[in-house]
Amino acid sequence: MHTCFDQDNVEQFEELLLEVGDRCRDYSGPVRAVILDWAGTTVDYGCIGPTEVFRRAFSGFGVTVDDEEIRVFMGLKKIDHVRAMTHQKTLSGRWRQVHGRDPNEQDVQDIYARIEPLMMDVVTDHAELIPGVRNLVTALRAKDIRIGSTTGYSRPMVERLMASAAGQGYKPDTVVCSTEVSEGRPYPWMCYVNAMTLDVFPMSAMIKIGDTVADIEEGLNAGMWTIGLTMSGNELGLSRREAESLAPDDLSSSLELIARRFRRAGAHYTARGVWEVLPLIEEIELRLSRGVRP
């Protein structure tokens, strides 16, 4: 089918392209949207739930996995996470001892098939809001900043989480799952869907906040500002009680190592948790007003 445009339509389209291009290149307005991760960022201090599920799923096949083998890939789409774990030399070696061969793609599918129902059972046990979430939401609403989210959870998983979070006062404007786009993190597609759904443009008017390197890479690939959370999430990997019981010097050293990791990944800013991000949003707005882009 061929579409014909008259001269007026062509001129209007060209004007629109120029307007959009100018807005993108010269944007100096306020932050218009914040895109938040879920586990380790807004709920489940320490990102404990997913770690427990991966451990139980592999145990069902007679293979033990440790926290580091799980957490290094946190933030990816869950099936991609499983696949990446099976490619680890030490883990594949333990699999070989049990099964007499290296893990293959069918094994990845079989492990993931166990993860889905396990996650459905566990996710609501780890749905408590992280301190600062409600205050952040209130402040963002007051500034007319829209709230989106991206997650490695599937839609059935996150719907249970959303219900628990809503009961505690957190309800983002939109939720995009990695299973709803062609590729999850570090690809930017979930952020782009958020932008379209929220009707926010340009991407430099948006901030991605998360607790994994994959979150940072996702935001950077989408052309957004990024804030990495060092204490509340996957990288430290401790519950709130465990984290707060650490000796101050030990905690400070651990958080600095995590912050360096995020900065190496390209994060514009780091914070211990969402309770510290409001001043950073104000600083980003100041930089935007001066013509700085992410």
Stretch-by-stretch model annotation:
Residues 1-32, 134, 138-139, 154-294:
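Asp-based, Mg2+/Mn2+-dependent phosphohydrolase catalytic module
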Residues 74-75, 151, 270:
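A structural signal for short, well-ordered beta-strand elements
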Residues 2-20, 24-134, 138-143, 159:
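N-terminal helical cap/lid subdomain that shapes the substrate entry/recognition surface
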